[in-house]
Amino acid sequence: MGDHVAQDSAHRRIVSNAEPHSSLYVNGCVLYFWVLGRMSSTLSLNVKRLGQILKEGAEGQVSESGQRLEVASSTYWPVLRQLLISDFNSTRATETAKQLFGNTTARFAAVDGSLNQSLLGGLAVFWAGAYAATGTITYRNDAEPILKYETNFLEKGNGLASCVPIYVDSIPDVELQSPLSWAGRQAISGPLTDQSTVDNSTISNWIMLFSELYLAYTFACGNECQVILLDRSLSGTQSSLLQDTSRRALWKRECATLTMKSDGLGLDEQDLAFSRYRTPNVDGLLPPRGDYLRHSVMFLLEKTNSPLTMDEISGRLYVSETDRIEKLRRYLTKAARESKYFAESNGKYSLLPNLDTAWQRTKKMVDHFGQRFFSSNAGNPLQITNAEGPRWLTTLDLAFLCLFTMNMLIETCRLRRILLIGVTKDTTARDMITHLIPLCISRQIWPGQIGHVPTTDRMLLQAVSMFHHAEVNVPWSTVEYDTAFQTIVRPFREVNGDVSGAVKNRIIQEQLFVKSYVQLDKSVSDDQFRSNVLFIDRLYHSFENAPTLELKHEYGGAIEEVRPILWKSKDVENRVQELIMVTLKAMTHESIPEIFGHNEPLFIADKIAKAQEAHASQMIKGMGHWLVSHPKLRKYAFYMNTFRSRRSEIENARTRA
């Protein structure tokens, strides 16, 4: 009783000096209510503090970034105003289309992919596919082109897909970077679950890339498409594939394709090396410099089909400087002595036997696996049989297949004058402001003095377009420049030459792809509200006769010449870029928010791919139910599931009950 009195007294003291929060009239009595304030706990104070830090930090970062971009746009404007092109003439584009395609109507294909990876007990299922939106574009004088799509995409559309079921314990035999494989470089800091093994696998990604490239290749070979669009960077994809296949020490041990000897599909390590850089110019050669020198000699000997002396080789490759001739001599002598690529007899060099047919056998290999993955019903597409029995293809095999398919696509597009275009969203590239512009300013190609800006090309160009909207009309594009500039920097100290390579002093192949940044749309009501800047790179064709720079690069003990493509200003005519910009602008759609300033055919291809992935996902789930209910497999189903998954399933069932 005493405790209740004490508590009541305490409550009276608390509210005696406080105004009532509200009152209520009940049965002739007025009841007053007080809301007693709660003392703040340590947890609530901590949440409040974190919220304050988050609010102030976010405001500060956004404000600082905006101010930095505003200053950068003003600083870069004197240079960028010379590089932004807004004058695209539909009449000239129609003339270019007629010269390039032989007609004012061209057929296009936009290719995109999707993937799915699921775990059914102990069985992993990897699905991936690529699908295309196709149609025609008709160019007109003094008017926008007319776009027409083929109908019934889901029923009659073009697509490729493949599915690979594989037990989780076999994934390390396929996935080189798996923590369970001998080549894995990850440290296992905790228990590795089956689900994490499947989630971290890249098998579906490799199959999706292979399907996208192979589908694009089939369109190029079909002699129907004049424009092929891919939802990825062409130069970035090729560079990544070259990097993924660069560790020659792994080839013999990890490439299952090297063990295939039947049906004329046998390849050896030298065949792989020969076909890796199979991206020659229209004359059949690579630039005779850097890492491409030996391959340039290989393709020259393949083209001439006869032995050549050292003088004949250097003459046909236009290598005249003493240091470059000596470097070429060292390469050839060492390779012939080690029986790699070349044989020497009486001072003349020739290709080793079978290398002259290496590219044809490589293409046959790609077509074989393309049919196996996407057309054949003969068993698991990722498993082959050699003299030693069944063996899994590895991700290194898939990387080689993707690289060779891309080389085949490039070769076919150049031969048939097809526009091959890559469209990349949300790029973080910064080579224009860190490589191209500083180099051109230092060589007095463009005037100005510009310091480092900690942002990306896309963000800077979006800021310039917004802050200078009165002077920059939409659509616009930067001038096109060689993707080799991504690896070209100003010369290092104590290095002869005009430039150096960004990584290990290497410069990638020039005159293969050119790139630009574009902005395609804006709001009707607000001129400053504009679409995102896109990164576009495309295959360069030698008939364009683009302007180039002559740069000296010291590499491998010789001063070599690099000739990257660069349209120096918006006033330099570029008819193919104009045709592409008119095409891309016609493929936008203002009324669909998801593709504001983007590409409608690629958007449709993405929707087709996602719809097919949804069907595949349901099929995979159905197969899981079939496995656990099949009379002959039921006794194995218990052990297919891990303890964790089985416990989780039982707990969920009990909770629902």
Task: Label the model's feature ranges.
Residues 2-3, 39:
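Short, Lys/Arg-enriched, disordered terminal segments
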Residues 14, 21-95, 99-101, 162-171, ...:
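Long, contiguous domain-sized segments
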Residues 3, 8-11, 21:
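Intrinsic-disorder-associated, low-complexity terminal segments enriched in Asp/Asn/His/Tyr and depleted
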Residues 113-158, 248-261:
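Adenosine ribonucleotide-centric catalytic and binding domains
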Residues 134-198:
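Compact, glycine/acidic-enriched structural inserts
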Residues 5-6, 16, 31, 138:
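Polar low-complexity intrinsically disordered regions enriched in Ser/Thr and small residues
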Residues 108-111:
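Short hydrophobic beta-strand that contains or immediately precedes a catalytic carboxylate
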